[in-house]
């Protein structure tokens, strides 16, 4: 495995711009992909967790843009694991203080976070020939269970679509047991989501709107300010050597 692993370690103070320049990419063999920056900040309109390869006339379609990740430590702070940029130069980068390592294992991205005696690893995997993405969190070390909150943020749009154009109609959330579907009108397939883990649940908060600024698009003179919609947030608990 060591021969197929590339590591980037982050000792001491970090250069914020470095987190925003370095990018990762995972593909599914259909033309679909997931991509982003090491910080989790979407700097390009093409960054997202699921850009699906759909039949014509849709083609590549942005289906799952962003995941806002909060880690709550027992009796301690709540740390945001991903960065966000809502307006020009308004970058939230708490993750820069807790990301200890980023590596590629067999070409797949792995983030290693360390905070207050807790070590957590995150992986992104796309099954071959499926428009599916798995985001996995594993508690490597820590004496007590930790709570993780995961807020999906979406904007269904064509791959080359403008980020500022709102959806033609409101999103609809359908819940069937522990499965969740977001429907964005007749032009798109539903986005199906599921959280597996201890005490996994979804808390609805009536649809939160998140501003997002795409800095690379702004530099290139393209449409660069948009919004993402979220139905609520998933939550679950992680114990040592367990996954969500």
List each model region and its residues:
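Terminal accessory carbohydrate-recognition/targeting modules of carbohydrate-active enzymes
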Residues: 1-244
């Amino acid at each position: 495995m060591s021969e197929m692993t590339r590591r980037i370690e982050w000792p001491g103070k970090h250069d914020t711009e470095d987190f925003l320049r370095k990018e990762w990419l995972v593909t599914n063999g259909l033309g679909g992909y997931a991509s982003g920056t090491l910080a989790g900040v979407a700097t390009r309109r093409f960054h997202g967790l699921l850009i699906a390869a759909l039949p014509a006339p849709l083609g590549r379609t942005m289906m799952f843009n962003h995941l806002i990740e909060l880690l709550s430590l027992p009796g301690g702070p709540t740390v945001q694991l991903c960065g966000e940029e809502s307006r020009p130069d308004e970058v939230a980068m708490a993750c820069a203080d807790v990301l200890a390592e980023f590596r590629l294992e067999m070409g797949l991205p792995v983030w290693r976070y360390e905070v207050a005696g807790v070590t957590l690893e995150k992986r992104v995997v796309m099954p071959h020939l499926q428009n599916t993405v798995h985001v996995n969190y594993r508690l490597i070390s820590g004496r007590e269970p930790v709570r993780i909150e995961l807020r999906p943020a979406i904007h269904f749009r064509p791959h080359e679509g403008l980020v500022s154009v709102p959806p033609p109609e409101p999103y609809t959330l359908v819940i069937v047991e522990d499965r969740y579907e977001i429907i964005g009108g007749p032009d798109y397939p539903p986005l199906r989501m599921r959280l597996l883990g201890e005490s996994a649940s979804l808390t609805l908060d009536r649809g939160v709107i998140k501003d997002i600024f795409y800095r690379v698009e702004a530099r290139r003179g393209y449409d660069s300010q948009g919004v993402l919609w979220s139905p609520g947030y998933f939550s679950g608990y992680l114990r040592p050597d367990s996954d969500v």
